[in-house]
Regions:
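Short beta-strand segments
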Residues: 80-83, 109, 220, 256-258, ...
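Active-site metal-binding loops of divalent metal-dependent hydrolases
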Residues: 37, 84, 192, 260-261
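Mid-to-C-terminal alpha-helical segments outside catalytic/metal-binding sites
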Residues: 3-18, 30-35, 60-78, 245, ...
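Boundary at the C-terminal end of the N-terminal hydrophobic targeting segment
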Residues: 18-25
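Short, electropositive alpha-helical surface patch
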Residues: 89-103, 242, 270-280
């Protein structure tokens, strides 16, 4: 073998080895923005309105450092915190907590539309860029026909904030009414698949079909894992039909990930909650999985790039 042949064969071998390494290299893990966590501290002087003392699972301090431990090495780079208190002052409590916790990339607060102080409170909290919207319960959303309620909801839209709706299957029709009233408002429906899904998903399909056609309505898939007669069902295949239906109805651009921690602890460890949906999206292409785990939430909430989430997608 001549020196030229040797150099050529060595170079070819190096190229082949590099290609082999590239082909077999494990792809980088998908970054995750968890769009549904609750943080609170029952030990503070004023206590908390929720959870109750009788809740042995949830009545304990739950803060960002605790969430980080539960996430382990799942590559959760940030979270959108969702209100867990009816107290107006707790909106500021979470915003203050976020100042020293860059893992919080957004906060969905709580104010009751129709109250005289709503507008002033909304402006005050919305001055903080981490305040990304409000969560509205079914008891408030069904009052959408009241002029004061409708006017307050329009204020949310005018500030380019979003609204989460909460209430299971009963919230679908009021959410549809809200979307018709304010078609430019970004709406996130919490906690699919609802508990009612297990009994009769077909009953919800007409409303879901209509909501799925509305471009600013997102489905938060954050209530997947179940227990039946106390036994945990952790086989991802069990949940595939529901996930397939939701992704079919809302499309790949309008489904978002939520872990619902620490409420999820009532059912399963956080790693299990994540694994069930991760298994489903592993069967899709990477672009679709990225949309679910972080890209779509950026469109829905317009969360703030900070901390580990500062360079996501760059």
């Amino acid at each position: 073998m001549t020196r030229r042949d040797f150099l050529y064969s060595s170079a070819a071998a190096s190229v082949l080895a590099a290609r082999t390494r590239a082909a077999t290299a494990k792809p980088a893990p998908i970054p995750i923005i968890d769009t549904h966590t609750h943080f609170y501290d029952p030990t503070r002087a004023q206590g908390v309105p929720w959870p109750p003392r009788t809740d042995e699972v949830l009545y304990r301090t739950r803060l960002p450092q605790d969430f980080k431990i539960h996430c382990g090495d799942l590559n959760v780079v940030g979270t959108v915190v969702v209100e867990a208190s009816e107290w107006v002052g707790d909106n500021q409590w979470i915003l203050d907590l976020a100042k020293t916790n860059p893992a919080i990339v957004g906060f969905v607060g709580h104010l009751v539309p129709g109250k005289p102080e709503f507008a002033d409170n909304l402006r005050r909290f919305a001055a903080d860029p981490l305040f990304r919207g409000l969560r509205i319960r079914s008891s408030d959303l069904v009052r959408i026909a009241e002029p004061a309620v409708a006017a307050d909801l329009k204020r949310v839209a005018d500030l380019d904030l979003s609204i989460d709706t909460l209430g299971g299957a009963a919230i679908l029709e009021p959410t549809l009414q809200l979307s018709r009233l304010l078609p430019g408002l970004r709406i996130v429906i919490d906690h699919f698949p609802f508990s009612e899904w297990d009994a009769n998903p077909a009953a919800m399909r007409p409303a879901l079909l209509e909501l799925g056609r509305r471009p600013n309505v997102f489905a938060k898939i954050s209530n997947v894992v179940r227990r039946v007669k106390g036994a945990l069902i952790d086989d991802p295949a069990h949940y595939r039909p529901a996930l397939e239906t939701l992704c079919e109805l809302f499309g790949p651009d309008r489904v978002v990930y939520g872990g619902n921690w620490p409420v999820s602890d009532r059912v399963a460890p956080y790693a299990t909650v994540h694994r069930v949906v991760a298994d489903y999206f592993a069967s899709k292409d990477r672009a679709t999985a990225e949309k679910y785990f972080w890209r779509n939430s950026a469109a829905a909430y317009r969360w703030v790039r900070r901390g580990a989430a500062a360079t996501v997608g760059q």
